[in-house]
């Protein structure tokens, strides 16, 4: 316990007494009984009883349980005597034993036995027990006059009943003194057990660092046993060092001014007196509250310790705190060996002279920068100086020592010279390297991060502009795609189109104003003549074979509602396109798609493939009801080419009659044809050309049909122009102004003839009018486009 008892104390204890509880704090506790009866130390008799009630008796309610606590008395030389107290239930009285030996468990058990005897009014038996203990010789391995462990001595006491001696019927008690060479263990050592239970590991480390720095430490608790146990256990953690300053485990109320002392101290204050202590001017005081488990310190004592030592304490203290054995004591002993184990290298041994300690040699050691900085402070500590003096005293007296501390130094040096030392060096180098690496990373990344932060706005604007341009590009592509799909209007039916049926029907409607509806202009379909002559029609749109009818792109279906919807087909534009194409390439002919659509629309719930037919078909119109004389006419062109050109056709049948619109053939390439200077403003009474019906024979759809060669007649062009002129636009015979139902009623389809069967076509009338030859086809088309 750090006491400096007399070399050979005369007895196991000096004084035993029982003090009564005073009525107020100003009164001294009365002594009810004592042993030995002739004890004459007046100073002790006046001062010691007041330590038996270290709490506010006026405010603190009496405890229903028995409490054990300890106080210490230090003389001018530094010798200490310990008072072991047992406070009875209800705090009516207190039993106390004053001794130089810090044997906590032994004296606590003695007090319990004496208390039980006194409670049974066996005063004689209690006095006999105390007399036997006082007269018992102290010589022996377990009863030494001075403890080598000092404050960290472990008391392993056993109380048993011995068999009665011969001729004596009384039972004797047996107490076993502690082993001076052992370390405190859990749960045998009550003080250490109370400390690890009441205080957390981190606060234990902070308390240990504050004691090594010799701070003013103040502990508070509402339980006396816990308060004194924490004070004594914290001192025991300093082994082999010894607390050389003021030590008061329980401060009585009349000594509260000691808390304001300027020197280092370790004082325990009961919870009932803590408020009065805090009212005093306390400066630079470390306060540990065991009840709330909090540590208040104005210093960084833990950071002053070497980092590897602190890491060792925090890591291993959690594992050994509540485990039985010497784990906690062994851990703190190892820490002390790491901190002060180098003192042996600073001992100077000169033959014939006493052994001395060289402070310069101790500081000249290079165990590491943190430990070297700690050594510079440690050489000025009173506990380190007292430790060195005690070691030198034994060496110069010729007494060897081989305690637990020296054994731990040897163990640590063996480890530090090998793996532990290399590990410490590696940790130091790693920390230095990591610091340099972090510094270099910061210096390199900070400019980049700053530039990235600054360019954040510009990057956002750049991304926004890119997104806008991408959206505009997609819109342009969609617009171009829509335009391309619109340009397919009026083209070959074999052109693959992904548009829906309604879109295709909408594209085939004429671009003109009908019934108050406005439609956009039809896109231009001019052919580039400067690039060269057009390719032959038979190469561009070959004849469909029966197997091609299965191709989904080779057929185009139309709803029956298309013909009955009231809309009209743009026959005039397609006729003009045919005239324009034939004007540039007179040897080629193609079928009109609108006429094909009319033929396809006549079919009920059937889909037919309409190929581009390279030759003209024998379309004939019914005779007009108002005109009884038919005007037959033929399609001009290269007859030899028409005879050599094969073709195929899909015929659609309706319920009542099948109508086939006629196909016009423009004049040959060499003959530009007559032109009109202006449109004919005549009313619709002008006759319109009609095709005569020719009787034919039915043949399979697969059989080709050949046209009979006819002579070209210039009247055909005239009559075609008269059809396209506005003079016929309002006539009933004009198919452009007639609904699809009327067209179907007026038209009749001619079935295909068998292979080799002749077909007769009547000649067209050769009547011509001079005023119809003035405008040209190109001018007429340009007029319609405008």
Swiss-Prot record:
Instruction: Output the lineage of the source organism.
Output: Eukaryota, Metazoa, Chordata, Craniata, Vertebrata
- Bias (Basic and acidic residues) occurs at 527-541, 770-786
Q: Name one GO cellular component term.
A: cytosol
Primary residence: cytoplasm
GO molecular function terms listed in the Swiss-Prot or TrEMBL record: guanyl-nucleotide exchange factor activity
> Polar residues bias: where?
542-552, 706-740
Q: Quote the subcellular location field of this record.
A: Cytoplasm, Cytosol; Cytoplasmic vesicle, Clathrin-coated vesicle
Source organism (scientific name): Mus musculus
Domain spans labelled cDENN:
182-318
Q: Say what the protein does.
A: Guanine nucleotide exchange factor (GEF) which may activate RAB8A, RAB13 and RAB35. Promotes the exchange of GDP to GTP, converting inactive GDP-bound Rab proteins into their active GTP-bound form.
**Where in this protein would one find the motif Clathrin box, according to its record?**
570-579
- Keyword Cytoplasm present in the record's keywords: the answer is yes
* Motif FXDXF motif: chain residues: 401-405
Every dDENN domain range: 320-398
Its subunit composition reads: Exhibits low nucleotide-independent RAB35-binding activity. Interacts with clathrin heavy chain/CLTC and with AP2A2, but not with AP2B1.
A Pfam family of the record is DENN
Residues modified to Phosphoserine: 565
Q: Which stretches does the entry tag as region Disordered?
A: 481-553, 653-741, 762-786
Name the keywords, alphabetized: Cytoplasm, Cytoplasmic vesicle, Guanine-nucleotide releasing factor, Phosphoprotein
Where is the uDENN domain positioned along the sequence?
A: 13-158
List, as start-end ranges, the regions of compositional bias called Low complexity: 657-675
According to UniProt, the name of this protein is DENN domain-containing protein 1C
